[in-house]
Amino acid sequence: MSKTELLDRWTIEKSEELYGIHNWGAGYFSISNQGEVLINPFRDTPEAAVSLIDIISGIRERGMEMPVLLRFENILDSQLSYLNESFAEAIATLGYQGVYRGVYPVKVNQQQQVIEEVIRFGQRYHHGLEVGSKAELIAALSVMKDQEACLICNGYKDEEFIDLGLYAVKMGFKL
């Protein structure tokens, strides 16, 4: 079979299957009828979708070269909402008397912009952070302002780590 014949038989569905986009895209990524990867920043909202090719073209028009790191705050915000609202729904359905306080494990992505967005958007849910090192604890203390949010300290605790944690408690944080 020639390359042309193969391409003539190729479908969007075959691209979706080949790349497993339904397995990892979670409604935030899809493939257009033109075969381009689309970013759906508000999950399953095709009217808000943006072509990855258009994003790359815009980046190049600004004189930037590849590779670049693309960060979609809307996706992070949407996932924080989904997580917290799912727990709120389960709590209400089951008549649970406690509250849910989510925490973001800093080790997953320590980039300042990500941590700041988790804190900024997550404040409505009192979403906190989980840290496992002195550096992470110091970073968390510098951005956390909501004293209803939890700050979870995991990992090896030397005297300095414990002192930092005790100072955080004095500052009003829940550890």
Regions found by a protein language model. Give the residues of each.
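N-terminal start-of-chain detector that recognizes signal peptides
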Residues: 2, 8-11, 74-77, 102, ...
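A short linear-motif detector with a strong N-terminal bias
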Residues: 7-10, 16-18, 46-48, 81-83, ...
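Active-site-proximal beta-alpha core segment in soluble small-molecule metabolic enzymes
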Residues: 95-175
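Low-complexity, highly charged intrinsically disordered N-terminal segments
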Residues: 32-110
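Short secondary-structure boundary micro-motifs
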Residues: 11-14, 20-22, 51-53, 58-59, ...
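Short, flexible coil/linker segments at or flanking structured domains
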Residues: 17-19, 64, 94, 125
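N-terminal basic/disordered segments at the start of proteins
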Residues: 2-45
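A general structural signal for short secondary-structure junctions and capping/turn motifs
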Residues: 18-21, 27-30, 58-61, 142-144, ...
